Amino acid sequence: MSSHGRTICKCRVKKTAGLHDELGLKGRTLIVFTGDNGSASSGTLNGEPYPKGKGRQADWGVHVPFIVRAPFLNKGGVVSRDLIDFTDLYPTFLDLAGVTPPKTLKLDGKSFVPSLRGDEDPFKKRSWIYSQIGDFRMIRDWYHIIDNKGAFHNLLKDPRQEQKVSPQDKIAPGRRQRLQMILDRFPKNAPAPFPEFKAKHPGLN
C-alpha cells in the first residue's frame, strides 16, 4: 500500500472510531479492521512489486492486517504474534456476547478474547494456520511455511519466499518435519473447504 493509501485508510478508521466515541459506544463496542485477502499481485511496497500476492498460496497472498479496538478489554497499543484465523471471529463474538454455542455446533475457530486481554494460556495458543486453494495447500506457524510441493521457507529471514530452506539446514529440520506431519494429515485428494467455489487458476504459487 502506498503512503497515500495508508493515510486515507488511517483517516477513515480514525473517523469511524471517533463516531463510536461520540455516540457513547466506546465502552461496549468491538471494532475489527482487516482484509479479505492478501496484497494485490499488481501492488507495490516501497517501490517494489509484491511477490506472490492475492490469489496465491504464499504468506503475502493470505496474510492480512488484523487490528482490533476493544478498550473494555485492554488499554491498546499492544502488538500480538498470536495466530488468528477468520474462523475465530464468530466464536469471539459469541464469547463477548456471553453466548455459549450448542455442543452440536461444530466450530473450526476459537475465541481470541484471551489474546485481547493478554492472558492467553501459551499452551492453548494456535500453533499453525492451514490454507488451501484448488489442489494447492500450505501450512505455516509463526516463522516458517511449507506447501504440498515441498517448498519450505523461513518467513523471518525471507518474507518474500524467494529462498527455499534446504532440508540439510541445521536449524530448520524439526520445524519442517512438524509442519510436514500436520500437512500430511490432510488427504491429498481432500476437497477445498468450500466445494461450491471453483478457482479459475487452481494451484497458483
Protein language model features and the residues they cover:
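Soluble non-cytosolic domains of exported or imported proteins
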Residues: 3-10, 80-87, 106, 170-173
